[in-house]
Amino acid sequence: MIGKQRLWQTSVVGLLLASFSLFSVLYMEQIERRMLEWFMVLRPGTMISSLWQSPAMDINVDLYIFNWTNSEKFSDPTVKPRFEELGPYRFTERMQKVNVEWHDENSTVSYRRRSRFDFDPKLSAGRPSDPIVAPNLLIVGLYQKMVMWSPMLRSLMLLALNIYGKEQAMIRPASDWMFDGFDTPMIKMSKMVPPSLVPEMKFPYEKIGYAYPRNGSMEIYGHHNVYTGRDEFRKLGQIARWRYNNVTEASPRCKLKGSAGEFHPIPLVKGRPISYFLPDLCRELQVDYSGTTIFEGIEAYVYRGSARNMANGTDNPDNSCYCQDNCQEVRSGLLNISSCWYGAPVFASYPHFYKADPYYGEQVEGMKPDKDRHEMVIMLEPKTGMVLEIKARIMANLLVEPKTHLIYRTARRTFFPLIWADYNVRITDDLLGYVKLMPILEFVGKICGILGVVLGVLMVFWYPHQMIWQKSLMHKIEISSIETNRSLEPVKNNDVEDSPLLKGLKYIGAKDAVGNGN
């Protein structure tokens, strides 16, 4: 009874082990994906949420500023503006998310972003004190707004500009053009004008600068609201609202979309582009799939910035909704981001007009587009969507147009390069170790699953058969032993009776017994 019970128990355990192991081997990728999804969903107090709020990876930011070397000849329309590139000015960005609020009702989380930029003189070719000549960004932006004003208000403003804003070019140290910013008479004048009289004159900051006031500010990047992935995992890290709106500031008909930068819809699909929502551009920017490569022994999907990503709405309908109403449509290669610069005619492009219409590079001198230095490249691990390396390069350009009664009235329509940034991010060695460990764990899991199937099959079939065979063998041995004993027993009895020695011993024993009895 005990043997049969043991056989049944062994068979059941073996069947369960084989079934579970076979299921694990066949659905290993699905199981791994479910576990990964559970781990990556943003929840309060988890390790992934802590890394998300305070990323372990520092961002190296190289800034390059364009110095206008022949500004004194700008009034001559036959002379092209000439620029020299100064830099890099290396900064280390340490980003943190603050004022984090969780919204379980719609599976989103809100936060503000605060970044600290620390200058690194050892890795910089330029000095903060380098003198930089650039067009008068503030005046150009104000002129752009004045076109929509009434004639009387415009005349009054032109009178004020003759006093406060005659400079067509400004010279400032590089640090002022970057994060420090600087004051101007125009900003002081704008503070004296009642906002109710001329709302367009309201300037949000006390200073002006290409990157001012990004250093340490948590207001400049705006209020973010992203999906946690709890209800729908593919939405993890995707932008839901920015500055409390779900549409862009450039056009209310254009919905916000794209990753906030940390997460991507996984698993990544070959041939499908990825998109980011960039607060510096106030819009989405797509990056096209380029192929695969090996990064530190890991397979990586490569995405590159293409001409299509920077095309206008005519060449790329995906970009059409970002330029509507009063937005200026330009040739492909530049994106209108005026709404992000408080109405100033600022456009984004790849550095040195890389992959842009040749028209832009022919307007100015000093542009040297280079694939290795100016291409945007992103490498991601396909199963987790984890960032392995980013080289994000973007340039800001100012459109200067001839206007009647203005200091630029003799100028030809030109896009002035102002500054470009090279954002470099690389995965840390610790995180890279975890990523490398994943395929090893997957391989070990499959091996263990196969061994589990083999062991389970042995427990179901081989072990019971072996037990039955051994029991049958023992039974045969017992029967054979009994038969052997029976065949040997008569032979032994006959030998004893015929033995003379044994007969003599019996006789002596019987005689002694009679003597003792007397």
Regions found by a protein language model. Give the residues of each.
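A positional/structural detector of protein chain ends, strongest at the extreme C-terminus
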Residues: 514-518
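Extracellular or lumenal secretory-pathway regions
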Residues: 2-299, 306-512
